[in-house]
Amino acid sequence: MSANSSSLATRVMRGAVAMLLLRWVTRVLGLVSVAITARLLTPDDFGVMGTASIVLGLFLNLSSSGGGEVLVRMKNLEPDHVHTVWTMRLLMSIPLALTLFLLSGPLSVWLHEPRVADVIKLVAFIPCFEALASPGPTLLAREMNFTRLFYLRVAVKFISVIATIVLAFVLRDYWALVLGQVSAALALIVVTHAFWP
């Protein structure tokens, strides 16, 4: 086995371990968040947020651009390619947000849950916030630098969990969960641009 093959195998193994750890750490942090917020909020609050998340998830699946995958697989990656994908992702997220915003009223009527309307209006813009993040994490995946990617994802999750718990103590309703999701998107912007301007 050549030195390059051995180095690649080592990086793949480290990446697999880092991604496995990431999955477990984020799950543990998520369980901590749920365990605490469940004592402060009602099942109804979780239902409102869950409904809005399902709606957002469906729209995101329909509008997925796959730009990140393109950057990872491209052989000769230039800065212009990165800038183009970043711009396209942002431009695609804006009509998605506006569509969801305008459909929030009819969707809340269809779902027989009037509180969902205002929640959808806010979570609709989460993809826009996430699109403003630096493409650094995608470039880390391309370079197979999964250890650094692990720290980034854990930092964002940790900030989101702390924000959600604090908001649950203060607000005592479903808006704590909604704003917790927004805080995760904002944390992603701050953390990625702090390390990859």
Residues covered by each model-derived region:
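Transmembrane alpha-helix boundary signature
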Residues: E69-V70, A97-W110, A131-E143
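Short hydrophobic/alpha-helical segments at membrane-entry points of transmembrane helices
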Residues: D118-I120, A176-L177
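C-terminal transmembrane helix end/exit motif
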Residues: M1, G68, P135-R142, F146-T147, ...
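Signature of the first transmembrane helix
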Residues: L8-G67, M92-S104, K121, I126, ...
